[in-house]
Amino acid sequence: MPDGTEKEFRGKLIIGADGVSSLVAREVRGAEIDPKHTCVAYRAYYSGVKGMNNTLEIHFVKSIMPGYFWIFPAGNGLANVGVGMVMGSMKKANISLQKAMLGIIGQNEMFKERFATAAQVSPIGAWSLPLGSKKRVVHADSVLLVGDAAGLVDPFSGEGIGNALLSGKLAATVADEALSAGDTSSAFLARYDERLWGEISNELSMSYNMQRLGGVEWLLNFVVSKASSSGKAREAISGTFTNKEAKKEYASPLFYLKLFLS
């Protein structure tokens, strides 16, 4: 409590929506961290970055592949700047992402001029994101997990809000059913897992395949080259971030054959 005192609250059912470091999730499945399905990210805010507009920039920089470097407009002349990489890849490459981020900003030929007069206006923050490429248990006796607590981040785009909203909607429905039936057992709440993963598992599997393909440098260079020279190819590739059918195509060898012939 604000005054430093402790209070205990009890309920018939808990919906864990307490984020990446969820205490509720730890009670359900322990302090689980799977390096293959966890993304590590570092971020800071900068003012005075040159060339900013309303575009969300994602750059695949060789020094941190298969990770990426981003520059996002944050309003009021600020930029959200950071790097992200799957934990397993980071450990395998024995790379310090914080040093890599500062190196890209200060030394990389593509970016050092853009940051020449920029100022870092926040500390560098670090966090980990549990990716939805691993089908985790998201229920237990009297407990449902939603959002980042459930580990639903898209492994390709890093986006988690859409799946978080869906999980909240499904959890509310199952919670209502459980309370109406007077049954909050794990067996009853298992329907939440079934419904949630039934909705999102195929798309997350496709995103995971796309993430892995993005780590193949020559293939990524080929795709980017095609996007630069062909409006049709550019439209097809950008669609993979938002369109389920486009994601299916991206994960298929035929997609690259079409790009090659375009």
Could you say what each language-model-derived stretch is?
Residues 1-117, 130:
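Predominantly flavin-linked oxidoreductase catalytic cores and closely associated redox partners
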